[in-house]
Every structure is written in structure tokens, then in C-alpha cells.
């Protein structure tokens, strides 16, 4: 919580800006099965890659040297933030991925998804 103790005027405004740039999150070292993997997050949201957007989702590896960009898809659940970035596909070729918030997976038919992804 943030306490703002002052005398307020009708025209006063509060602007709160929080960083929501996409980032990679690593698991605790005690989670050995997740060694060499990372999850994608932005702000408080954890993202996943879903088969609906990434046909080769099960074999994608994150390119940790690549960039990620936060975007928006108005056609997904009446508007959803998405992250796009660079990956390596199952044939060791550069590829791109689209990640959606974990809360949004499974809304476009049956298909797999992943939260934890191998890194390059």
C-alpha cells in the first residue's frame, strides 16, 4: 500500500507507472527439473505459449539473446496483452513465438501449452 497524506484539490491527479517490460523468470535452484528453463512474465502476469499460436510449441527454445516485445491482441478474449519474441525451433532455426497470459490459455480449442520453456 502507498499512503498519500496531503490536502487534496479537485484537480489533483495521481499517476502510477509500473514497469511491465517482458522478462525471463528462472525457477529456484531447488526445482532441478526446471534447470535450463525460463518462464516469461510482464508486470505481475505469467505468460505461456499455446499451440494455437505456436504450431511447434513443444520444441521451441527461448533465444535468451533475442528481444521480446509487449503487444495487444484485440481478437483474443475481447483484448489481451501478448508477448512476441525470438525462439529456436525444433530444426535449430530462428523462429518467433507468441505468448499469452496464463489466465487466457485454453480459450481457442484443444491444444497444448507451456509455461516453462528451455533456453538456448
Q: What is each PLM-predicted segment?
A:
Residues 6, 13-120:
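C-terminal beta-rich recognition modules with glycine/proline-rich loops and embedded aromatic residues
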